[in-house]
Amino acid sequence: MPFMPCRGRERADPVVYIVDDDPDMNDALADLLDSAGMRSKSYVSADAFLSTPIGEEPSCLVLDVRLRGANGLDVQQELKRRGIALPIVFITGYGDIEMTVQAMKAGAVDFLAKPFRDQTFLDAVSQAIAVDRTKRRAVRCGDDLRARFATLTEREREVMTLAVAGLMNKQIAGEIGVSEVTVKIHRGRAMRKMSARTFADLVKMAIELDRAAPALHDRRDQSSAPRYAGGTTPQSMAASYG
């Protein structure tokens, strides 16, 4: 069974935000999405969209490049400035290669020139939703792991850090000045609290915690990087488990 660190579920069905200054185009795209079972919210200006809070559900943005009083590429940069990683499908009747390249380099999922086929549009939106779903799941899983790690005692964190670094129970006992039996107890408790079915799972969880915040499981100082014995890392340990 693959390693699945997260337990949370998505909060709602996906939503597609549509920003086009042509009301008829907005309505047509909304109807198309509705026919495919997708929810949508439409806006006729960049300002109207940018003043709207983005929900917690998986979502994407269908954005016209040339809006009245605004440039779709500028909207893309503004979202990035705000830290909003919303996948974007650009649509335009005036696209050129330079504009397409600029949008894609900035992270756009697709760039569609009007007129486009209905299925082409739906495929692009589905891909964008999938991208956002993956990102949100990664965040959710990271939050879940951090919450579990926070329940460990200082000693359990200490033992976990040394164990995933490759030290045997006897070595850990000598390192922290306790008996080997005590190490086994703390290691078992750490695995239960982390919901790790196997030690390999615990190693993979340590890798995920490292990626999110390396100092989370440093046993000496919460502000410094973790120390691993003999050059061993959680990544190399995980590789040995396949």
Predicted stretch roles:
Residues 168-201:
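Recognition helix of helix-turn-helix DNA-binding domains
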Residues 12-25, 29-33, 46, 61, ...:
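Conserved acidic segment of CheY-like receiver
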